[in-house]
Amino acid sequence: MYQIVRTEKADNQLRDLIYYIADDSVSVDVALNYLDKLEKAMMRLSEFPESGSTPRYAILRKQGYKVLIVEKHLAFYKVDHTNKVVTIYAVVDSRQEYRNLI
């Protein structure tokens, strides 16, 4: 099993996303259910760290990122096989230009 770690940036992006969903849907339950879905998907990486896709941008591929797709959101991460750690660097909306958000 791999340890899952999120950077401060990823935590902030995730928090902002959940606040936005709660505000937009006028339902905290909708936001919390989506957070649960995202976190479950990220936790599955502890057992299947290579299950993410290859990013479409070459610069991200060259830097060793993988991407986990959850509905309209992307979680960018790297796998450290030596230390058995998956580090999540960013959680972004797939519809925005995200190269500079990671």
Predicted ranges, named:
Residues 1-37:
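Arg/Lys-rich, positively charged N-terminal/basic patches that mediate binding to nucleic acids
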